[in-house]
């Protein structure tokens, strides 16, 4: 994994996107964000991304799980760390889908520090003290 892996943050809440992007950069990650599934797919076509943080509940009919399903079909993302971050309650089927596609589930308001530590583990990085 790269020294400064780039993380794509998909969340429809501008405050969450901005906060996550800033904090990821503080912890030594590159960060880019998207508010919709279409924006995220465009980012993935144009930028090298090594990890993803996806919100489940997006405005409209698409979800972060839709991106999870499509991205795992692409060989370059087969082993990419994907964290699912949601404030809602998921069904057993949704949780099974997340597990089956090798993603990791975090419920808001899980501390961002916990999420970054887990991302550090998945990317093989040590977070600066």
How would you label these PLM feature ranges?
Residues 85-86:
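Hydrophobic/aromatic residues positioned on beta-strands within the core alpha/beta folds
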Residues 14-32:
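Two-component/phosphorelay signaling modules centered on CheY-like receiver
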Residues 1-8, 110-129:
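Non-catalytic signal-transmission and effector/linker regions of two-component phosphorelay proteins
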Residues 4, 48-50, 75-81:
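His-Asp phosphorelay/catalytic-motif detector in bacterial-type signaling
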Residues 11-12, 55:
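Acidic di-acidic motifs
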Residues 36, 62-66:
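Acidic catalytic/metal-coordinating carboxylates
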Residues 42, 65-78:
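Short amphipathic alpha-helix used as the core "switch/output" element in two-component signaling
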Residues 47-58:
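Active-site beta3 strand of CheY-like receiver
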